């Protein structure tokens, strides 16, 4: 679980962190968690599943049945009558499969989280560079690109058109490449989240140590 003390900068932050820690201790969650349940889920669940995986002492019965089928047994009577060596093989099969299932859920949830996703936008560094260059040359919102007519209108209305790096030919290509890659990464993260939730629902009753 991510710490409530992670971003303390002021006295107010400190006292809020104490409050959140008390809320977690007394009711299992705090206001910070409720501000973003999705973030809480993606930050917390992988570590919980990791704990289940590392401390498990059994596996779902359906995986025992799968192991029996794998080794040609059709009933619990046959399993009970089998040699100890064969029963151990079946148990090892189920335990290994359960570990793989938990590992896959952990992986998918971490990939769905933008803070832990393995996918990196190859244009990130260049995007940051041109964004900073644009800001220094033309202002935060492209104020230095305003025409005289736009400046005159801005004096009357109190607002002016906003210009972004993508509006200039020199930056347009890298911005488009960056945004296209961001879209691909977002799609990938969404698919990982959906698959993880599907698995979470399927194995919900088996998620215990």
Predicted regions mapped to residue ranges:
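Long, non-globular targeting/processing and low-complexity regions
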Residues: 1-204
């Amino acid at each position: 679980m991510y710490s409530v003390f992670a971003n303390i900068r002021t006295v107010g932050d400190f006292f809020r962190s104490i409050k959140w820690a008390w809320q977690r201790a007394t009711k299992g969650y705090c206001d910070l968690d409720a501000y973003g349940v999705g973030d809480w889920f993606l930050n917390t669940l992988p570590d919980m599943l990791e704990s289940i995986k590392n401390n498990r002492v059994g596996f779902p019965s359906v995986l025992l049945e799968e192991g029996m089928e794998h080794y040609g047994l059709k009933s619990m009577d046959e399993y009970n009558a089998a040699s100890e060596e064969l029963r151990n093989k079946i148990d090892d099969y189920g335990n290994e499969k359960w570990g793989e299932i938990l590992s896959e859920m952990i992986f998918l949830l971490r990939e769905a989280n933008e803070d832990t996703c393995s996918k990196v936008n190859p244009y990130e560094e260049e995007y940051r560079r041109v964004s900073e260059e644009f800001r220094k040359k033309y202002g935060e919102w492209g104020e230095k690109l305003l025409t005289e007519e736009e400046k005159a209108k801005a004096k009357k209305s109190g607002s002016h058109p906003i210009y972004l790096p993508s509006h200039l030919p020199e930056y347009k290509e890298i911005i488009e490449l960056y945004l296209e890659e961001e879209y691909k990464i977002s799609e990938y993260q969404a698919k990982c989240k959906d698959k993880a939730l599907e698995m979470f629902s399927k194995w919900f009753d088996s998620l215990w140590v």
